[in-house]
Amino acid sequence: MAATILQGKEVAQSIRAELANEVVELKKQGVVPGLTVVIVGDDPASHSYVRGKAKGCEEVGISSEIIRKDADITEEELLVIIQQLNENPNVNGILVQLPLPAHISEHAVIEAIAPEKDVDGFHPISIGNMVLGNDTMLPCTPHGIIELIKRTGTQMAGKHAVVIGRSNIVGKPVSLLLQQENATVTMCHSRTQNLEEYTQKADILVVATGRAHMIGKEHVKPGAVVIDVGVNRIETGKLVGDVKFDEVKDVASFITPVPGGVGPMTITMLLKNTVAAAKKQAKQ
């Protein structure tokens, strides 16, 4: 039986419609959610992501600003900009687009953002709160993955979830969020031996390795929910995931396509975090 294709775009659209209604209500109370994105250098992929974020803001009624800086900006100059945004009451969310040039410490930049404006969910305080299960800004891609799984109607409690990849941006946080949904979680990575032994037992399989087509049908338990986070451009110029979509879709119960699966959810969760930040800051 062929899998149901989990179109992140459709789920994202329904969440954005809910957010747009929330923003209308906030504006009636004089609160206009505001997001500022800082981008350094001229990486085409980064500029494309930033345009997507600005478009998303416009769609739901969030006020957005993009601050573009040349790659030769100093770390000190960038930290001054962040401090000014921290102090600006019209800015509810601050996002510094990664990656940054080598001479700027990502760690220092992320730590400089006020935790209440950390809509990417990367600040150590946000991460600590997530580990403790406290109410906090969740990292956008992992949060989007959990929302996608929920929309399949899959009960995560008691299920075996396998996460391949242990990055700070996806692998580690999504494994934590799956645990908080009471799944039993196994984390695999580049050093894991006999990968199939783990993946074949997964009711939920999240693949975030950045290696094109590394997961085939032989890795997948029949009926599993497969979430493909990878985005890889192959020699033909085509974008593909970490999963061999055409063969795995015949084994899985649900599968995300690339592109159009997890990607649209990431920006939508950023918008959700910005609206949540605006609400919290309005109460303070």
Swiss-Prot record:
Domain of life: Bacteria
Subunit structure, as described in the record: Homodimer.
InterPro entries in UniProt: Aminoacid_DH-like_N_sf, NAD(P)-bd_dom_sf, THF_DH/CycHdrlase, THF_DH/CycHdrlase_cat_dom, THF_DH/CycHdrlase_CS, THF_DH/CycHdrlase_NAD-bd_dom
Pathway named in the protein's UniProt entry: One-carbon metabolism; tetrahydrofolate interconversion
Reactions catalysed according to its record: (6R)-5,10-methylene-5,6,7,8-tetrahydrofolate + NADP(+) = (6R)-5,10-methenyltetrahydrofolate + NADPH; (6R)-5,10-methenyltetrahydrofolate + H2O = (6R)-10-formyltetrahydrofolate + H(+)
Amino-acid positions noted as binding NADP(+) in the UniProt annotation, renumbered to this chain: 165-167, 190, 231
Keywords: Amino-acid biosynthesis, Histidine biosynthesis, Hydrolase, Methionine biosynthesis, Multifunctional enzyme, NADP, One-carbon metabolism, Oxidoreductase, Purine biosynthesis
Family assignment from sequence similarity: Belongs to the tetrahydrofolate dehydrogenase/cyclohydrolase family.
Task performed by this protein: Catalyzes the oxidation of 5,10-methylenetetrahydrofolate to 5,10-methenyltetrahydrofolate and then the hydrolysis of 5,10-methenyltetrahydrofolate to 10-formyltetrahydrofolate.
Annotated Gene Ontology cellular component terms: cytosol
Protein name per UniProt: Bifunctional protein FolD
GO molecular function annotations of the record: methenyltetrahydrofolate cyclohydrolase activity; methylenetetrahydrofolate dehydrogenase (NADP+) activity
Gene: folD
One record GO biological process: purine nucleotide biosynthetic process
UniProt EC number: 1.5.1.5, 3.5.4.9
